[in-house]
Amino acid sequence: AYDATRDADGHPYGGRYFLAPSKADMERLVAAEREWSSRKDADLRVQWPREELPFAYMTHQANFALPEQGYTHWYTMFNPRQLVDHATLLRAVVTGQASEAVKHQALGAVQQYLRNNNGFAIWNIQADKLEPFFSNSNYAPKDRFIENSVFGVLGRGNWLSCAEGIVEGVSWMAR
């Protein structure tokens, strides 16, 4: 959460702080579950993976066998709110009126956003920040689950920061 007064008073983190979920937050989660249920086989039906996780050493044998932890399909790595966000962003990219080159660049931002918003991203206590999926090479289920705001302007892993990385890359390439 953010509090401008705390920011103006000089509190640590520029007025940002962790906030326990409120009743309204829980209602938003329920609303996201309902939205996902109503849209997943309608307008978003081709924007999410239904495939089972392929058998591989890192997913089925090493560390934690993901199917034994409840992760049987790619979509099980996301909660319903994340699935709505991801599928909606992906749909906007693939159905948009942009050129193929711009769509490919936007897909790069979607890929980065996926890394930062899933059930395997964590809060890194030592570094005091979100760490995206594949920060290391294991698929171990996480005990410090974190979720950020899709369109927030602060922090790592929101849509803005993921899209900015693509813009920076294109600018660098044009030098």
What are the functions of these language-model segments?
Residues 1-175:
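Nucleic-acid modification enzymes, centered on SAM-dependent nucleic-acid methyltransferases
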